[in-house]
Amino acid sequence: MNKLALYCRPGFEKEVAAEIADQASHLGVFGFARVQDNSGYVIFECYQPDEADRLARDIPFNRLIFARQMMVISGLLEDLDPADRISPIVTAFEELSQQVNFAQSSELFVETADTNEAKELSTFCRKFTVPLRQALKKQGWLSAKATQKSGQFLHCFFVKPNCCYVGYSYVDNHSPHFMGIPRLKFPADAPSRSTLKLEEAILTFIPRKEENKRLNENMIGVDLGACPGGWTYQLVKRGLFVYAVDHGKMAASLHDTGRIEHCAEDGFKFQPPKRKKVDWLVCDMVEQPSRISLLIGKWLLNGWCRETIFNLKLPMKKRYQEVILCLENLAVMLAEQNLNFEIQAKHLYHDREEITVHIALKP
């Protein structure tokens, strides 16, 4: 068990490779990444046996920015017989189970990468899931409750119709979503599809049980670069009153809610109204990531907000390095003022050439 598989958006394999190598080295684990451009996944191979399992346990999944899923895998199973793919797959799982007790496993995902080529396998994967699940249950696996907070999910990752990896992820340190992708439905009354970015960010960064406490009708938000209102929509839907800052027009449907005030100003120059306590700042402006980072830092240091979600648009080259630089600079700015804070960042499914960052100031 010396291999990890990590899913990602196609085109971001090098960023995942750099990130997993960094995170592994912090734990004293070393290896190399197998990268195929635009494949939608990376295989990280550790130099020492059993270290992949350690990484899957000890690298906090929520600290990985570019990875959608992280799991320990077998070697590649090749030339599977179309008449009986299940037997060698079960055998591979049995080998993994010598090290990990799959009696605590609760779910099976038969998956592909998120590419057009791989998606051609999606119908096969869906049909194959039922007989494979039955075969694994005969081994005494997949019997744990889906709501448990420990144990594993089992994964069968097909790269071709006759080639797959089998593996597992830890329930307390993975994405619970199939292929690592949350399925969100576009609201018919939302002004733009960008609304899904903020919805996914809220679901990713804020625990469900805390959402009503941290986003509610007693709060005020500011949306910088708000037009036409995709992000404002998500705040208004949760009851917030929003100052929507943009020279462009906002959707009439948002004005009709009575929960927004349109401020036709430059997002970089806008300051919150005096005697108003702003709880949330959101920002999805197309600008250099370093400039956005400074803007967000200014809001937090001035006490203009307590919590923020914003996007950093990525450069064409050295994307991982630029992200780390921006996040480190923000952390230094806040730490120098003795602020207690939490930073999370993720390349969300609904992001493209950008990442989404969440910062919360703590008491």
Curated annotation (Swiss-Prot):
Q: Sorted alphabetically, which Gene3D superfamilies does this protein's record hold?
A: 3.30.2300.20, 3.30.70.2810, Vaccinia Virus protein VP39 (3.40.50.150)
Catalytic activity annotated for this protein?
Answer: cytidine(2498) in 23S rRNA + S-adenosyl-L-methionine = 2'-O-methylcytidine(2498) in 23S rRNA + S-adenosyl-L-homocysteine + H(+)
Q: Where is the active site?
A: 313
**Positions with a binding annotation for S-adenosyl-L-methionine:** 194, 227-230, 246, 266, 284
Q: Where in the cell is it found?
A: Cytoplasm
Main localization of the protein described in the UniProt heading = cytoplasm
Which terms does the record give in the GO molecular function aspect? S-adenosylmethionine-dependent methyltransferase activity
GO terms in the biological process aspect are:
methylation; rRNA processing
* Gene Ontology CC entries for this record: cytoplasm
Q: Does the keyword Methyltransferase apply?
A: yes
UniProt keywords, alphabetically: Cytoplasm, Methyltransferase, rRNA processing, S-adenosyl-L-methionine, Transferase
User: According to the UniProt entry, what is the EC number of this protein?
Assistant: 2.1.1.186
Q: Which domain of life is it from?
A: Bacteria
Subunit: Monomer.
Functional note: Catalyzes the 2'-O-methylation at nucleotide C2498 in 23S rRNA.
Concerning its family, UniProt says: Belongs to the class I-like SAM-binding methyltransferase superfamily. RNA methyltransferase RlmE family. RlmM subfamily.
Q: Which PANTHER family match?
A: RIBOSOMAL RNA LARGE SUBUNIT METHYLTRANSFERASE M, RIBOSOMAL RNA METHYLTRANSFERASE FTSJ DOMAIN-CONTAINING PROTEIN
**Family matches, as NCBIfam families:** PRK11760.1
According to UniProt, the name of this protein is Ribosomal RNA large subunit methyltransferase M
